[in-house]
Amino acid sequence: MTEIAGSSDVVERGLVTYSNEAKRELLGVAAETLAAHGAVSEATAREMAAGALRASRADLAVAITGVAGPGGGSAEKPVGLVHFACAGPGDRLVAIERRYGEIGRGAVRLASVVQALEMLAAAAKA
């Protein structure tokens, strides 16, 4: 997202929170949410986006949590499962789920970035 010159005009910060500890400490994801739903869940994505918005001076925040692969999947949460959430002003919060399948780690990551940018664009127009 920051490869384009001038991106600092619209990107205030980015957080990478792979561990549950980072999700709790940096984004305020509740330990109860992680215990009940796991890191890869709609509930966690929603709390991540809301926490990112609170932790910044931004108008919008997007969160992604998923299983890019090649390992780490399960029957319930297979490789390619990704949850997204976009938070905006006035408690506006939209979440979606995508199941990309086993298309390769790089392809899952790229598709996830595209989806996140589409969510941000839609939220900016709303």
What are these regions (language model features)?
Residues T2-A126:
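Short alpha-helical segments enriched in small residues
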